[in-house]
Amino acid sequence: MLKPLGDRVILQQQEEEEQTIGGIVIANNAKEKPQSGKVVAVNDGRVLDNGTKVDPSVKVGDQVLFDKYAGTEVKYQGAKYLVLHEKDIVAIED
């Protein structure tokens, strides 16, 4: 598995529905980029300029919401992931 560096987190994005409740099929180019995902890897924490270590706010398995244009999509061993900075995560789902 990939291990994120710095203050980065690796997510597996939620897939968008292929059709609406009314049964209308949505074209791939009309779909919005998903803004939620499951945390699959986190860093060990980041170090501030004064040397203080800050532990990550999220843990593996958390369902999170993130900024719309955050992160970089990567493919690794046939799967798609999103690598983003922890600051781009806006909420953890209960």
Curated annotation (Swiss-Prot):
Signal peptide as annotated in the record: none
Localization terms from the record: Cytoplasm
GO biological-process terms attached to the record: chaperone cofactor-dependent protein refolding
Any Pfam family hit: Cpn10
A GO CC term attached to the entry: cytoplasm
Gene3D superfamilies assigned: GroES chaperonin
SUPFAM superfamilies for this protein: GroES-like
InterPro entries, A to Z: Chaperonin_GroES (IPR020818), Chaperonin_GroES_sf (IPR037124), Chaprnonin_Cpn10_CS (IPR018369), GroES-like_sf (IPR011032)
Keywords recorded for this protein, A-Z: Chaperone, Cytoplasm
Domain of life: Bacteria
GO molecular function: ATP binding; metal ion binding; protein folding chaperone; protein-folding chaperone binding; unfolded protein binding
Chief localisation class: cytoplasm
Complexes and interactors: Heptamer of 7 subunits arranged in a ring. Interacts with the chaperonin GroEL.
Function: Together with the chaperonin GroEL, plays an essential role in assisting protein folding. The GroEL-GroES system forms a nano-cage that allows encapsulation of the non-native substrate proteins and provides a physical environment optimized to promote and accelerate protein folding. GroES binds to the apical surface of the GroEL ring, thereby capping the opening of the GroEL channel.
Similarity comment: Belongs to the GroES chaperonin family.
Protein name from the UniProt record: Co-chaperonin GroES
